[in-house]
Amino acid sequence: MTENHYLLLTPGPLTTTKTVKEVMLYDWCTWDVEYNTMVQDVRAKLVSLATKEEEKYTTVLMQGSGTFSVEAVIGSVIPKNGKLLVCTNGAYGKRIVQMAEMLHIDVVVSQTEEWEPTNVVEVEKILQQDKEITHIAIVHCETTTGIINPIVDVCKLGKQYGKVTLVDAMSSFGGIEIDIAELQIDFLISSANKCIQGVPGFGFVIAKRDELLKCKGQARSLSLDLYDQWETMENQNGKWRFTSPTHVVHAFYQALLELEKEGGVKARYNRYDNNQKLLVNRMREIGFKPLVDEKYQSPIITSFIYPEEWFDFEQLYNELKRDGFVIYPGKISKVDTFRIGNIGDVHEADINRLVDSIAKGVVIG
């Protein structure tokens, strides 16, 4: 277990290593050449994680939570006469819809139940019927439940019908192998405090260069102007337009080095996947059932159904916190659930200790 007051079993912010925390003990200037060079290195490393066709893509770092980066994409990429199709089966897909509505972007929704993946057949029907759609957005890992959505099929469809593809990979990038060139993703969005195991403070967009260049002058916000942010970073050696989170960037750079040391995304995926399978197997032994079908389940976070009407999540939460663990409440409307994440600096021994603690506090007949 990492040295910490408790272990975060959440989808981010998450438990970070001691070495990631330690680099934040120092202060840096945003104009320093060494710092800006580090920003450029971070941008390049992210592209190399995302695809082998590195020359076709670029990275934009954006201050704020991951949602800021999603909104930067929605508000900058879609022109005034554009129309967005959003595939949603959870809170984060709904949030994209809300962004589009707030920004007065024409939006249509493909909705499935929260425990079911995006329906590719329905998506194609919508694309066939509505020729005005220009962009399609989907959440890869919907952390509302932990479900994985079929981005391969949806992006393939998007390109078949000539659409720009936007993927919210907030809780999957760095933990699940993705080649955005192979998948034909034009814009992929993620955040520092997810599978790369940094801390909160900025998100990032990995964009296809030729699509990003079309975004100039389209932004509906000054601070969330994706093109202007990129142009400044690109032309001024990693400079941010406005004050950047220097401590967070250094922590993220350290986290990237640690990802490489672990063996890259494939090795990290294997650790997360082993954590998740161990978690489910041990939770089943003490009477808890996962919400999502195994074939759609991500290695990121798992939703468990309340076992009985008498089950008291708040009591379990408080008991686990006293034992050094923090888990997540449920976030769906039709079924009572709670969620346990297994990303971050979390290992098999941590999962075993967690379930031992749950078993101690809950007796299920």
Swiss-Prot record:
It holds the Pfam family Aminotran_5. GO terms for molecular function: 2-aminoethylphosphonate-pyruvate transaminase activity. Its cofactor is pyridoxal 5'-phosphate. It catalyses: (2-aminoethyl)phosphonate + pyruvate = phosphonoacetaldehyde + L-alanine. It is an enzyme of class 2 (transferase). GO terms for biological process: organic phosphonate catabolic process. It comes from the Bacteria. Keywords: Aminotransferase, Pyridoxal phosphate, Pyruvate, Transferase. Its EC number is 2.6.1.37. The modification N6-(pyridoxal phosphate)lysine is found at K194. Belongs to the class-V pyridoxal-phosphate-dependent aminotransferase family. PhnW subfamily. Involved in phosphonate degradation. Homodimer. This is 2-aminoethylphosphonate--pyruvate transaminase.
